From Swiss-Prot:
Alphabetized InterPro entries for the sequence: Actin (IPR004000), Actin/actin-like_CS (IPR020902), Actin_CS (IPR004001), ATPase_NBD (IPR043129)
Gene Ontology biological-process annotations: phagocytosis
Protein name per Swiss-Prot or TrEMBL: Actin-18
Name of encoding gene: act18
Annotated localization: Cytoplasm, Cytoskeleton
Main location: cytoplasm
Cysteine disulfide partners in this protein: none
CDD domains: ASKHA_NBD_actin
Coiled-coil annotated spans: none
Origin organism lineage: Eukaryota, Amoebozoa, Evosea, Eumycetozoa, Dictyostelia
Enzyme class: hydrolase
Organism: Dictyostelium discoideum
Length: 380
């Protein structure tokens, strides 16, 4: 089979959302929640022709009688049976393709355990019978989507954040820093501070409302303390939000207090460094000769970097940390929510990439460990 003639499939599996589509496209065709729902009680719903499992939005809309599970926790796959269900749903329901006819590019988080990489490879070749596959690091793909091969990426999604220094297309393993603070933690914090204001959000449906408030109304303050004073002395920063039942609530300083936790994890009672310090610490672990290329190419990626004001604040914080002669540049592309997927789409459609795929023949000869040889991704 001539691989060039067939469009490759690109799947970016995140802790919260799965993004999937075809290489060469400029956006994913399918974006759905990475959840698997299974009936809580057998027999009760048989009359309605109930299925054994539901994926994504289908699972969400039936959550009343399903047990919902996220197979990816903090960026790492923890349940392979459920993960397989999500991939099956992606191929057959979302994209309407036969996986045995398309090469598949999957994404992984930095420092993904070796056995996980092997398991992904095994499932693609043995369960889905793909003709070829490849596994690429999410942050490296984000960098590609910005048209660069050297830079530092702060990738922050729903489950986990990483600072990854990349030189000429290869991640520098010793400089990868992980931060277990991301979108889910910000939503929990928003719920906590709104509860203190007297609003109550407890059910799963209400948690979705919190997420919506966070995504629509939050922003990052350039100067947090000054913004707190402004919020205390006037109502200019207040916004109204209409709940599904028609009730209108007011959101004030919560708008910027919520994402402030990215810069001040102590607000969540966490002792870790903020995202700005994490970027700085990653750069400082790199060779002194390449630091200026990293400071000059700071790429923000992932849904939890979508807050208005985040790039200006990052510039201010890094300028304060870096040597005074260093030129700082923050790149925050408007489509950065999907930049990992877009980078995968670009990579998989390059003619120079076609020899990089792991073929079915190579897999049959070497087994799952072939993934470490063919998809090294790291600078040796």
């Amino acid at each position: 089979m001539e691989r060039e003639e067939v469009q490759a499939i690109v799947i970016d599996n995140g802790s919260d959302m799965c993004k999937a589509g075809f290489a060469g496209d400029d956006a994913p065709r399918a974006v759905f929640q990475s959840i698997v729902g299974r009936p809580r009680y057998t027999g009760v719903m048989d009359v309605m022709g109930q299925k054994d499992s539901y994926i994504g939005d289908e699972a969400h809309s039936r959550k009343g009688f399903l047990t919902l599970k996220y197979p990816i926790e903090r960026g790492i796959v923890t349940n392979w049976d459920d993960m397989e269900e999500i991939w099956h749903h992606t191929f057959y329901n979302e994209l309407g393709v036969a996986p045995e006819e398309h090469p598949v590019l999957l994404t992984e988080q930095p420092l993904n355990p070796k056995k996980n990489r092997e398991k992904m490879t095994q499932i693609m070749f043995e369960t889905f019978n793909t003709p070829a596959m490849y596994v690429a690091i999410q942050a490296v793909l984000s960098l590609y989507s910005s048209g660069r091969t050297t830079g530092i990426v702060m990738d922050s999604g729903d489950g986990v954040s990483h600072a990854v220094s990349i030189y000429e297309g290869h991640a520098l393993p010793h400089a990868i820093l992980r931060l277990d603070l991301a979108g889910r933690d910000l939503s929990d914090y928003m719920m906590k501070i709104l509860t203190k204001r007297g609003y109550s959000f407890t059910t799963t449906a209400e948690k979705e409302i919190i997420k919506d408030i966070k995504e629509k109304l939050s922003y990052v303050a350039l100067d947090f303390d000054a913004e707190m004073l402004t919020a205390a002395s006037s109502t200019t920063l207040e916004k109204s939000y209409e709940l599904p039942d028609g009730k209108v609530i007011t959101i004030g300083n919560e708008r910027f207090r919520c994402p402030e936790a990215l810069f001040q994890p102590s607000l969540l009672a966490m002792e870790s460094a903020g995202i700005h310090e994490t970027i700085y610490n990653s750069i400082m672990k790199c060779d002194v000769d390449i630091r200026r290329y990293l400071f000059g190419n700071v790429i923000l990626s992932g849904g939890s970097t979508m807050f208005p004001g985040i790039a200006d604040r990052m510039n201010k914080e890094l300028t304060a940390l870096a040597p005074s002669t260093m030129k700082i540049k923050i790149i925050a592309p408007p489509e950065r929510k999907y930049s990992v997927w877009v980078g995968g789409s670009i990579l998989a459609s390059l003619s120079s990439f076609q020899e990089m795929w792991i073929s079915k023949e190579e897999y049959n000869e070497s087994g799952p460990s072939i993934v470490h040889r063919k998809c090294s991704n790291y600078l040796k």
